[in-house]
Structure formats: C-alpha cells, structure tokens
Amino acid sequence: MKFGYFDDRNKEYVITTPQTPLPWINYLGSEDFFSLVSNTAGGYSFYRDARMRRLTRYRYNNSPLDMDGHRIYINDGGTIWNPGWQPAKTELDSYTCRHGLGYTILQGEKNGIAAAQELFVPRGDACEIDRLTLENKTTAPRTLDVFSYVEFCLWDAMDDSSNFQRNFSTGEVEVVESAIYHKTEYRERRNHYAVFWANTPVTSFDTSRDAFCGVYGGPAAPEAVKAGHCSNSIVHGWAPVGAHHFHLTLAPGEKKSIIFGLGYIENPVREKFSAPGIINKARAEAMMARYATDAQVDAARRALADYWQELLSGWQLTSGEEKLDRMVSLWNQYQCMVTFNMSRSASYYESGIGRGMGFRDSCQDLLGFVHMIPSRARERILDIAATQFEDGSAYHQYQPLTKKGN
C-alpha cells in the first residue's frame, strides 16, 4: 500500500492517508524551542529539554496511539472533525499531510469546508505558530464552532507523570482575552511560564481538562466540542489545559484564518512580576504582537525557508539518479540537523525523560552536520567537553538544560 510521495519541488514528503502504519512525525524547531508533530497533528512541545521544560503532555503508550497533540476541532452542525483526522476520526472527504523543512501542513475537507492547519517554529522565538485557514467551498453561508486544544505539562515531565498526589493540587492558569497563561509554580519556584494564544477574540474558553473533555470524556469527543461551546473554566489544580472556542460564519467562497501560538516565556528573577502577585506578561505580549497577522506569519515562514535553503546549499549532489540525489541533497542533511538538535533525546519512543543527550552519540552526530553549521558544531563540542571530569571520564548521558548526568 502506498502512503505518500516525495514532492521534490516543494521539498516535502506528502502523506495521503491519516492511517499510516504508525504515526509519521516531523521535528519542528532549530534553536531552543521544539515541537514534534505527527501526520495527524499529534505530538508535544518543549523548550531546550524534553524532561525539564516540557510544555505539553504526551502519553507514549496510550491506546489508541497519538491522541495528545496540537488539536483543532470543527463542529459543523453536529458533525465533529479534525483537519488531521485524529482524534475524532471522522472520515474526511480529502486529506493530505505535508511534512516540510521545519514545518507541517495538514489539509482536510468535510462537507464543503476546507481546513488547513500549518505548524512551524519560527526562527528567533521560543514558540510554535499554528495557523488555521478555513474556506467555505459551498454556495451557502456556513456557521461553524471551531476549537483549539492543548494539555499543559507541569514542566518536569518525569514528575508530571508520577507525582500525582502533589500535582493534582498545583496547576495554575490565568486568562487575558484570547491568551491562556499556564503559570504553575511560577510564584515560588519558577521564573518561566507558557502562553497559548489566538489572534482572534474568543467566544468562550476552557482551562480545565474535566470541563473541556468531561470527567469521563476524552480528546476523541470532548464534551465542550459536542455542546458547541466552552464553559470559561478556570482550573485550580487537577489538569490545566488551553482551549479556545470561536463561533464563525463563512460566506460562500470566503476564507478566514486564525493564528494560534504556544510560547515559552522566561523572565529575569527581578522582573518576574509587574505588580505584587501579577506575572510579568511584557515578553509574552511582545511575542504575540510579532505573529498577530497573516503577513507577519508569512514573513516568518519565508525566513525559515531561507534558513533551510542556506543550510542545504553547501552540499548538493547531481548523480543522474533521482532517488540518490534526493536522499543526499535534502533528506539526509535534514535528518542530520534534526539529530543534532535532539541527539535522539526526544521522539515517540524515547520519551526525553530519562536518557537526555548521549556523550558518544553526540560526538558521532557532529560528523553529519559540521559542514552545514560549523559554529553550532563548535558549541556542541564545548558542551560535550564540559561534561567530562578531570580524569577524562564523562557522563554517559546528560540533560541538555543542566549539563548534568543521569
């Protein structure tokens, strides 16, 4: 069975069915912020360290697979579907997933409504941008209820998945207009928080998983999506989430976009609060302003494309064999850069919780990307050397955030 094909012109792998043998994932990010996204919009996000700065939860051994992720729901008169098929699993009239260089685009269509979900991590910012574009392809107006959904991790992914007696009482959020701030432990233990925002005024929102999904519900059919609205819940403890709801009407042939962002904000200790007990949102507000319009998002995508074009231009093969040229000139180099960023420390099989960066593996990985980005190779060599002891021994593996072994 054929599941997709290479689009050499656009430098993409195009997946033509959501039901691949296993989730097929792309790695977004090239600096400090990373997201894993599958061909059905599953995955998770983290800042630098998949254990110690995890923004969103992921259940690796869940059944069914790949239910956690970067979710968009569309309720069209009671028909609930996702642009990437999961988790609702409503049969789509058409589906494609385009895994590109640092971005993924999911395109789904159902009953004359087309939805494109475009995800990427921009250069120079610690955030993921998730742009949804809706189009009414029919000759009649269509009214839709559109929802976003992410489930926040309480930062330390190891503790988050084990210390439940404590974690069920620590979750804390704040909502300002269309921005949902996840600020668990910010007051006393941390100087960083996450923000999940939209550039469009919300109709309603939720921050409680129980309110959005239902105590006995789940991401396949959340109670809020079935009801057509959220309940404006403010969670205290339990499971904090971010969910936006928009009630939209599209005229025949009309297109509308909503820009979502998931960002990581770290404040200097002296600048943690803008007033007693009020988190300093200045950096978050500046980040949101940088991606408030389609023109700004388009510019960020072009900058990302230019970055990859420059990286790949130094080594190109013309052998007369199309498949060999494609592997050497594009996908092998892309994979080497992903390996440089991750060092196998985070995937759908390596949870990022226990392994960290391998000393030997990271040394070997240098051979694959040093020609593309020698300055970053030098940084990696110094990082690896910094974990060695005076007698020449070293940690077998270490956490990328702290450089401490585990």
Model-found features: residue ranges?
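Anionic coordination/interaction segments
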Residues: 1-360, 374-383, 387
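Short alpha-helix boundary/capping motifs
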Residues: 160, 174, 393-395, 405
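Carbohydrate-binding/catalytic loop surfaces
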Residues: 347-356, 395-406
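Well-ordered alpha-helical scaffold segments within catalytic/enzyme domains
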Residues: 363-375
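Short, mixed-charge aromatic SLiMs
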Residues: 386-396
